[in-house]
Amino acid sequence: RRPVVRLLFDGYNAYATDEGYLFAAPQSSALYVPVMTGSYAPPAPASYTGSIADYTAARIAESEGRIAEIEREKYPLYRAERENDENIKALRRMTIKKGLFERRENFERRVKELREKKARLRREYRYTARVLQERIDKISARQAAEREKQKKLRKSYEDFLKLLNFVVLVEKDDFWRSEIVQIVVAKGPDGAPEIELVPRTGSHTVIFGSPDDAEEKLAKLLTFYRRGLRNIGWEEYRTINVKYKEQVVCTK
């Protein structure tokens, strides 16, 4: 396998191929590829060797198993709901017929007792229905949390592939392959990776932002190098920010 980047994040010392296969850096030798550092953490643990796609798929499969296991906790609650619904239907069918020779006072007393009984049972059944639904909702919330974990796993995998694609893009260009010394990656406010580049020329840092629209950003940076820094000097700015569309923002 041919690596495209070396990962030197906290606890990591591994190589990655363009397809997202990770393997540990050999102790006896080093492969000369771009280096990524920073506070970013790849989707798989530092000790992992193998395909990130396989790792992500396995974690999602485990999560699906937990969701199915949690779903089984609902079964007795569903049965209790059906029983409660049947009780409510039976309650509606409860009536009293006046006996042929029954005195009116006695019949009215029985009607009153039935009304009180039905009112009491109706409250009990409604309470039972509410409690059962609350318990089901709590279980569903745990399932939703698992699905949210799956979304984060997929997003983390997609973000990692974007970083690898960025490295491949840099390596295909003779100028950028020579100019970019280090790629620093951190997590942005939304959890997505944010890139900073350490160039060989000058004393500035390039704030690149997300790996999205990488070709456009690199083209914009190259234009600024040729038309800007070449005239005013490579040591003029401390940071050059190309993360914003159609803008280059510099700080001294």
Task: Report residues per predicted region.
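Charged, solvent-exposed interaction patches on well-folded alpha/beta domains
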Residues: 1-252
